[in-house]
Amino acid sequence: MNITEFLNNGAQEKGFSFEVLPPLKGNGTAALFRTIDALKEFNPRFINITTHHSEFVYKELDNGLLTRQRVRRRPGTVAIAGAIQNKYDIPVIPHVICSGASKEDIEYELLDLQFLGISNLLVLRGDKAKDDRQFTPTANGHMHATDLLKQVNQFNDGFFMDGTPIKHPGEKFCCGVACYPEKHEEAPNLEMDMQHLLE
């Protein structure tokens, strides 16, 4: 079921939703499932699952030099979304982000989500890297959420990003987007920010 159906009926029926983070790498799902077990009595309409991109950390070597390593502290958004939907039969909305993902990564993520029967997405640019002054896309990645949304819409229309037709397209994704109510820090003004939201 598409989340828009819940939202369109919102005036008649109030409800809750929750947002969860994937477990830290190596921690398993037990604590997350205990949290959902405690919250499911509120009958959540859906559960959002955040996505966290990789970051670089510096580790000291035995010789005193530093080495830069790529670390993803919270992997598994797609797998967690599938596990929650399967275990609890509650619709899920995984976050799909530009940060740390190439267009190919996103295409494979969309395929994985479709295989799992997950049709609701929250499409976001994602945060800039911790030490960066401004957002820098991954090589062959998207700079803006609007570009990512175009890729999802092309997938919905039955085409991979290289233009190849999808032989057996699955259910189309229902996409949500987000904005900052006070204006995004990179937008020159509120009007321009609204223009990008409407794209």
Name these PLM-found stretches.
Residues 61-94, 140-177:
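Alpha-helix-loop-beta-strand connector modules within alpha/beta enzyme cores
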Residues 19, 47, 113:
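Conserved, mostly hydrophobic/aromatic
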Residues 102-154:
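Flexible, glycine-rich active-site loops centered on histidine and acidic residues
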Residues 1-18, 160-173:
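N-terminal amphipathic alpha-helix/helix-capping segment at the start of soluble metabolic enzymes
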Residues 23, 42-75, 129-139, 199:
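Glycine-rich, proline-tolerant flexible connector loops at the mouths of alpha/beta enzymes
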Residues 15-33, 91-104, 174-194:
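Active-site mouth loops of central-metabolism enzymes
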